[in-house]
Amino acid sequence: MQKLKTELLMSINRRKFIKHTAVAGSALLASTLINDEAHAAAANNKLTILHTNDVHSRLEPFPMDGSRNQGMGGVAARAALVESIRKETEHVLLLDAGDIFQGTPYFNMYKGEPEMKAMTMMGYDAATMGNHDFDGGIENFATQLQHASFPILICNYDFSNTPLENKTAPYKIFQKGKIKIGILGLGIELEGLVPQNLYGKTIYQDPILAANKTADILKKQGCDLIICLSHLGDKYDDGKISDEILAKETENIDLILGGHTHRFFEIPRKYTNKKQNEVLVNQVGWAGIQLGRIDYDFSLYSAGKRVASKSILIRNK
């Protein structure tokens, strides 16, 4: 009888243990699934913007000759840096603000083909045009586009009746996780800066009007973040249209990634637009010495929250 009681008690204890273990296991599994889902949801609300400007055909790093920039830049180190960021961050956009061409013998000899191929290899998502991108002539730029897997965005140049007709776009919309991003491009006035025979019948249009019109289209299409790739230059003493004026005189642009003036910003500049909203402007010098990085987290605020920004020095090891 005692033996039967002992066996029965052991059986009951085993059932309790199995039941409790199953419950605990289910709770642990549910907790793990919830944590995984929460992590995935958080990742879908985060976006990393990487950007360059005025690389000027600098495919190789500066030589180790004792100069200030020795060992800096070069597509190999930039590609490795971009790849490492993509491995740690799911949603990344890689952008360029113009003056891809001119500045080294590579352009003199190959007219931009290796530059476009290098950017394609690195997975650039979009770029705009700078004045030096016309240095080989508008026909040459149109020819080199066959080597680019990314779009050239520019909304204030009318390329009708030129070799670039229907080969650029005013904007493009990207979907990264739950975030919808609209990107537009702006170019500087070419007259007086570029010989007319190099840009042909290209018509320059007011960048403020063009930017407001294009950004309004992007806003109406539900974009959570609107980025302008600008080759206007950051600011001028003579009142010439610049990124500073653009930021203040537009309504829906959130971030301006600039070029032309070769400024190394330590942190993005902040301006207030016509709707009293914050606009960030950033620029990372020239020659591919730095890679700009701006991180957004849209899970914190519906309008988006910048959580970090930095310029990363590209140095060869």
Language-model segment annotations:
Residues 4-315:
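Acidic, metal/ion-coordinating pockets
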